[in-house]
Amino acid sequence: MLVTTKEMFEKSMKENYAIGAFNVNNMEIIQAIVDAAAEEKSPVILQASSSAIKYARINYLMKMVEAATEEHPEIPVA
């Protein structure tokens, strides 16, 4: 499920845990990160650098992230 980082941080600060943030630039990396987060039952932050956005294009990255959240709706993703 897509959530805001504000929601994520509020919960993590109350429950005293960290959230991993990972740079993404293609489908395989997004799949691997979200699959690992699902395996660990952990929220995750996906981020893209300006060069990754230029390389992969923001619309493609957004659709790939949406697909990953549909595959793992139980995992909070920002």
State what each model feature region is:
Residues M1-G20:
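N-terminal amphipathic alpha-helix/helix-capping segment at the start of soluble metabolic enzymes
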Residues M1-L2, V24, I58:
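A short linear-motif detector with a strong N-terminal bias
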Residues N23, I33:
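Conserved, mostly hydrophobic/aromatic
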Residues V24-M27, S49-S51:
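Active-site beta-loop-alpha junctions enriched in small/polar residues
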Residues I29-Q31:
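Short, well-ordered alpha-helical microsegments
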Residues E39-A78:
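Active-site cofactor/substrate anionic-group-binding motifs, chiefly glycine-
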